[in-house]
Curated annotation (Swiss-Prot):
This is Transmembrane protein 168. GO terms for cellular component: nuclear membrane; transport vesicle. Plays a key role in maintaining the cardiac electrical stability by modulating cell surface expression of SCN5A. May play a role in the modulation of anxiety behavior by regulating GABAergic neuronal system in the nucleus accumbens. The keyword Transmembrane helix applies. GO terms for molecular function: sodium channel regulator activity. One of its GO terms (biological process) is regulation of ubiquitin-dependent protein catabolic process. Glycans are attached at N111, N533, N598.
């Protein structure tokens, strides 16, 4: 008896200590990354303190000493609020504001008389070290999966540091200070542009970096400190271009779900910014040196700019009008499974966005031409406004581009559930023993309910959900799948996406085990798909909840003439039954549907110790997939419906310019990069554009 108790006690203690070691390993890794961030912050604080001390020592300016002591006092208050009163938000807000302010002072105070001082050189090296540590910390956080991306335009940290930096610029003359404040606004717009993954965000970043160190922009006296401020703010949104798995509507949620008045005011605000840029561009007319070039050029391209931006503002206004209609439906049926993106698709928003993308491109082109014609290298305010307008129009272009690519795709789904997960020695599925039938029926019913919920939530037309305890014959499955693959919409064309779900017994090679000893190979299914799809550009997504889905996931990556994806499950075979139940068919379906139908889920596919893992693969051309684009007649009808008659001549120009395909080189390079990413750096979460995502552990 004592031996049994001693054995049970020692066994439980061993399990507890093993689990504690695993938790400690995970916590230690997370803590190490967090401490790396603290180290970067402390290193930056030391650099700021040393830099301000050098400036006070060399200039004997008592104001620097007062501000320096006040800054340390404020940081001390922030620490007290954090550790003794648990006021984390107030503490972090106060410290971030002062970090931005003190770093701004370090930038703007003149250091020309002591550039070669040892302490000043040490400050520069500390700032460079802070840049390296900040980039390393952000990269490790994202690689380790410790960052949970949330939809936001600007984080509180970014906003407060930008405000603090702008306040520090008031130590300069009014004109120089205004130039820097506008530059800070441009940096905020660039951060939002990157976080939204706009199509032209990277070119905007390059342009901003090139123009940043123009003398006319009143670049601070300490370019290293300015580079530290710039890079530390840009690092997170730049890395999130790859690491963020948020869909288009999730990224734009702070804007799309904003109230009607706020969105209308944003259009008015955008119009004021555009008008200010045009007025500043007109200052070029004072240049009498090249009057024979400036006056005709500004007259011609200024008129072109005005017409394009009238269209630009009307396009934004029309977009918000249609979005308001979508909001009415959304808030009326919030209890249903109708999300805003699906409502926008049903309201024809995709067609509107595809045409608007072309129109906003004209605005970008007109802004670039007008900026080149009225270039003022000695006017810092003009250049700052130019850097504000570019990301603003880039975001509008990116919004229409991405919504046009992800909205409006029709889809149809078919589910097959064969609850026969026991095999005879020759590999044929056999019926389960009677004592397991009830349990299996409950599990299979749960799978059917889950997949039907998935179809209903994402507004996927349901062809059928077949459930067969005795299995399906090859001929029966052949007729059903062929009928499914040749389905068309009510209007006549094929659906954009076909979703096939299968849960049942498979062989080790991934083949579906059918009744009568038959099997269904992936090659056979692809041949049926080619036969029915023909020259159309529809997609096929196969979702497998089976024990041997990995072979199909690997095999689909070799297909190069179709748009096909396979989402599979991987069941861990060796599981400690005292810690977790062994995985069963249906567990993956339950988690995957919950992940795609509940935005507040807590499912982490990369979590250690998962008994059911996800794996997916896509064909080589998957990233090239695009929906139907509007024709020239579609653009003409849209123009006549939304814009004044005076702008009609631009219809022919729009059709002609879009027909030139000016970005064919960029699109080709972008397509190659996307193919490279999908083949070598397959993302953990892949947005299908239909509202749901493919995932891998």
């Amino acid at each position: 008896m004592c031996k049994s108790l001693r054995y049970c006690f020692s066994h439980c203690l061993y399990l507890a200590m093993t689990r504690l070691e695993e938790v400690n390993r995970e916590v230690n890794m997370h803590s190490s990354v967090r401490y790396l961030g603290y180290l970067a912050r402390i290193n930056l604080l030391v650099a700021i303190c040393l830099g301000l001390y050098v400036r006070w020592e060399k200039t004997a300016n008592s104001l620097i000493l007062v501000i320096f002591i006040l800054g340390l006092f404020v940081l001390g208050i922030a620490s007290i609020l954090y550790y003794y009163f648990s006021m984390e938000a107030a503490s972090l807000s106060l410290s971030n504001l002062w970090f931005g302010f003190l770093l701004g002072l370090l930038c703007f105070l003149d250091n020309s008389s002591f550039k070669n001082d040892v302490k000043e050189e040490s400050t520069k090296y500390l700032l460079l070290t802070s840049i390296v540590l900040r980039i390393l910390c952000s990269l490790v956080e994202r690689i380790s999966g410790y960052v949970r991306h949330r939809p936001t335009l600007l984080t509180t940290v970014e906003f407060l540091e930008l405000v603090g930096f702008a306040i520090a610029s008031t130590t300069m003359l009014v004109e120089k200070s205004l130039s820097v404040i506008l530059l800070v606004v441009a940096l905020a717009m660039l951060i939002i542009d990157l976080r939204m993954k706009s199509f032209l965000a990277i070119p905007n970043l390059v342009i901003f970096a090139v123009l940043l160190f123009f003398s006319s922009l009143e670049t601070p006296k300490n370019p290293i400190a300015f580079a530290c401020f710039f890079i530390c703010l840009i690092t997170d949104p730049f890395l999130d271009i790859y690491f963020s798995g948020l869909s288009v509507t999730e990224r734009w949620k702070p804007f799309l779900y904003r109230g009607r008045i706020c969105r209308r005011l944003s259009v008015v605000f955008a119009g004021m910014i555009e008008l200010t840029f045009f007025i500043l561009s007109a200052f070029k007319l004072r240049d009498t040196h090249l009057w024979y070039f400036v006056i005709p050029g500004f007259s011609i391209f200024g008129i072109f700019w005005m017409i394009c931006h009238i269209i630009f503002l009307l396009t934004l206004w029309g977009f918000h009008t249609k979005l308001n209609d979508c909001h009415k439906v959304y808030f009326t049926h919030r209890t249903d499974y109708n999300s805003l993106d699906r409502i926008m698709a049903s309201k024809g928003m995709r067609h509107f966005c595809l045409i608007s993308e072309q129109l906003v491109f004209f605005s970008l082109l007109a802004t670039a031409i007008l900026g080149a014609v009225s270039w003022q290298p000695t006017n810092g305010i003009f250049l700052s406004m130019f850097l504000i307008v570019l990301p603003l129009e880039s975001m509008a272009h990116g919004l229409f581009h991405e919504l046009g690519n992800c909205l409006g795709g029709t889809s149809v789904g078919y589910a097959i559930v064969i609850p026969t997960n026991f095999c005879s020695p020759d590999g044929q599925p056999t019926l389960l023993p009677p004592e397991h039938v009830q349990e299996l029926n409950l599990r299979s019913t749960g799978m059917l309910n889950a997949i039907q919920r998935f179809f209903a939530y994402h507004m996927i037309e349901t062809y059928g959900c077949d459930y067969s305890t005795s299995g399906l014959s090859f001929d029966t499955l052949h007729s059903k799948l062929k009928a499914f693959l040749e389905l068309r919409t009510v209007d006549g064309p094929r659906h954009d996406t076909y979703i096939l779900y299968y849960s049942g017994h498979t062989h080790g090679t991934g083949e579906w085990a059918l009744a009568g000893g038959d099997t269904l190979r992936l090659d056979t299914l692809i041949e049926w798909w080619r036969e029915k799809n023909g020259s159309f550009c529809s997609r096929l997504i196969i979702v497998l909840d089976s024990e041997n889905s990995t072979p199909w996931v690997k095999e689909v990556r070799k297909i190069n003439d179709q748009y096909i994806a396979v989402q599979g499950a991987e069941l861990i075979k060796t599981v400690d039954i005292e810690e977790a139940d062994p995985p069963q068919l249906g567990d993956f379906t339950k988690d995957w549907v919950e992940y795609n139908c509940n935005s507040s889920n807590n499912i982490c596919w990369t979590e250690k110790g998962r008994t059911v893992k996800a794996v997916y693969g896509v064909s080589k051309r998957w990233s090239d997939y695009t929906l139907h684009l509007p024709t020239g007649s579609d653009v003409a009808k849209h123009w006549m419906l939304h814009f004044p008659r005076i702008t009609y001549p631009l219809v022919h120009l729009a059709n002609w310019l879009c027909g030139l395909n000016l970005f064919w080189i960029c699109k080709t390079c972008f397509r190659c990069l996307k193919r490279l990413k999908m083949s070598w750096f397959l993302p953990t979460v892949l947005d299908t554009g239909q509202g749901f995502k493919l995932v891998k552990s």
